UniProtKB/Swiss-Prot annotation:
Homodimer. Interacts with HypD. Also forms a complex with HypD and HypE. Interacts with the precursor form of HycE (pre-HycE), the large subunit of hydrogenase 3. Disruption phenotype: Deletion of both hybG and hypC completely abolishes hydrogenase activity. One of its GO terms (biological process) is protein maturation. InterPro entries: Hydgase_assmbl_chp_CS, Hydrogenase_HupF/HypC. Disulfide bonds: none annotated. This is Hydrogenase maturation factor HypC. Belongs to the HupF/HypC family.
Amino acid sequence: MCIGVPGQIRTIDGNQAKVDVCGIQRDVDLTLVGSCDENGQPRVGQWVLVHVGFAMSVINEAEARDTLDALQNMFDVEPDVGALLYGEEK
């Protein structure tokens, strides 16, 4: 099973972005979703679902918050989920 983690795009340089995932800045490749939206505007501030360093899809903020809440609930039961959220067990 693959789990994507929501993150908010902070900066973009070409197809690479700095994405905030639970307060941690991660390097993410935007090749699959593009660095600009359908109107040609940079995706800075938008939410993406991140898996193994790639933005897999663009999601809205409500979906991002719901997913983060669900992952946090999983973390409360299974500490290994912390690696997805925080980069290590917390």
